[in-house]
Amino acid sequence: MTPKKCLVLLCTYNGEQYLRCQLDSVLSQTGVETHIRCADDRSTDGTVAILEEYRERYPDRFAYTVNEQNKRFTYNFLDLFFSTADTDYDYYAFCDQDDYWLPEKVSAAMAKIEAAEPHPNGVFYCSNLTVADEDLRPKGLQEDPWMLRRTTTATVKCENIATGCTVVMDAAFHRHALRHYPQGILLHDFWLFLIAVFTARAIYDKNAYILYRQHGTNQIGTNKKKFSFAGLRKFSRMKSKYPALMRELVAGYGDLIPAEDLRDIETIRDYRQKFGCRMKLLFCRRFRRRSAKLTLILKVEILTGKF
C-alpha cells in the first residue's frame, strides 16, 4: 500500500544550532511519507547551508526558498502556507526549527483525524507537547489534564491552545483555510485554530508526540505560572492581537459562523472602539479563560487594551 503523504511547512531564521536534529526527526516519521517545504527568513548564520545540504540529500522530499525580505514569524508561516495552494498532499503540518518529533507524531495525528467525525470543511488537529530543556531532557507537559477539561468553545475565543508545531490538518481543511488571506494578525496557529473551531472540525490530543525544546529567549511551558518581573516587562510590551484576529475571521468566514458565536466574535473585534463591547467583555461570564487566575489576567488585558 502506498503510504499517505504529509507536507511539513518549516520556517527558519538563524536556527543552525538545532536544525539538523529537527529535520532528521521529521524525515524519519513512521507510517507516512513526509516532505518538507521551508521558507528561510534571511538567516545570517549557517542555516541556509544546512538547508542546501538537505535539499541535495533529499531532492524529492525537501525544498526551500530564501525570502527576499524579512517577513517575521507569523507572515513567514502564512505566506508559506498560502504558497501550497497548488499542492496535493493528504495532510499538512507546521514545524519549528529547534524541536524533536517522536517517530509516530504525524501518524498519530492522522489516526485521530481519520477517527474524528467528518466535516465538509475538514479536520484540524493539535496536541499537547512535552517541554524539554536544550538537551531534550523532558520537563513536563505543557497542558495538564485539569486545564484541558475546562476548555470550551467559550474559552477558545479568549485563549489559544493550539501550538503551531503540533498542528496537522487534512487536505479538506487545507483548502478551506486558503479561502481568506488575513491582514495584520499575530499568531498563524491561533488563526487556523479559530477557523477550525467555528467553521470546521477541531480536535485536541491530550497526548504529546514532540519534545518542545526550550533555550535562550523561548522559555515557556512548565514555568509559565510563576511570577517574574520579566513577565511584567513582557506584558507592558504586549500588543493587542484578538481584535485583528476576529476582524479577519468575520471578513473571511463570517457567513459560516453560528449566530451566537458571531456576536461574541464581533464584540471582541470592536471592544477597543466601543465602550459597550468592553463592558460586555469585562462582565459577561461567557468571556473567560480556563481558570480564575487566567480569567483575571484576561480582564486586566481588556482594561489596558492589551487583549
Model-derived regions, located:
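C-terminal subregions of glycosyltransferases and related glycan-biosynthesis enzymes
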Residues: R179-I185, R213-F307
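Nucleotide-sugar donor-binding/catalytic module of glycosyltransferases
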Residues: M1-K225
